[in-house]
A protein has these predicted regions:
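C-terminal motif of bacterial Sec signal peptides marking the signal peptidase cleavage site
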Residues: 5-8
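Bacterial signal peptide processing site
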Residues: 10-13
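Post-signal peptide N-terminal segment of mature Sec-exported envelope proteins
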Residues: 17-38
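Extracellular/periplasmic metallocenter environments
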Residues: 17-23, 70-77, 111-158
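N-terminal edge beta-strand
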Residues: 33-64
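Short beta-strand and strand-turn-strand segments in soluble, beta-rich domains
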Residues: 48-50, 103-114
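Beta-strand acidic-aromatic groove motif in beta-rich domains, primarily in extracellular
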Residues: 76-84
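Short edge-strand/loop segments of extracellular domains
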Residues: 83-92, 157-158
Length: 158
């Protein structure tokens, strides 16, 4: 004669609790998105002198990127912005920016634009945030008319 005895160590309540705990952890991870902060200075008082003070920005994929744009120019004509774009689209974006005009902050409605700041007048500081795109190489540029050749850099997302 043999007797089989079965014991159950788990319950439906434990399974549901585990699922709920995992969902909570995921929600916390999303709400604790890392913020990467960068300060970019717009320098120069003439077309020949104007530039951003840093050539590259590197951020992690999916992070929140916080940009502080400081326009250190004194000349009233030196108005700047900073626009993050798909790599290799700078000339296209610059041309479209002129057409889009001041009312759009010289940021064209183009799918190659990732994010862009307000216009910063001389002596003004602008702060804005955006989510870093997928891993890859991108660019940043001032799209104020005539500035894109001198005021540009690379945005690397790791």
């Amino acid at each position: 004669m043999s007797i089989s005895i079965l014991f159950s160590c788990g319950s439906k309540d434990n399974v549901e609790k585990t699922i709920n705990d995992n969902q909570t952890k995921t929600e916390l991870t999303k709400s604790e998105q890392k913020i990467e902060e960068f300060t970019v200075r717009a320098l120069g008082n003439t077309m020949a002198e104007m530039k951003f003070d840093i050539p590259n920005i590197t951020a992690k994929e999916g992070s929140k990127v916080k940009i502080t744009l400081i326009n250190e120019s004194m000349d009233p004509a030196m108005i700047h912005n900073i626009v993050f774009i798909e790599y290799g689209t700078r000339k296209e974006i610059a041309m479209e920016a002129i057409e889009s005009g001041m009312s759009s902050k010289y940021i064209p409605n183009n799918s190659n634009v990732i994010a862009g700041s307000d216009l910063a007048n001389p002596g003004e500081t602008i702060i804005f945030e955006f989510d870093a795109p997928k891993k890859g190489n991108y660019e940043f540029v001032c799209t104020y008319p005539g500035h894109s050749e001198m005021m540009r850099g690379y945005f690397f997302v790791k």
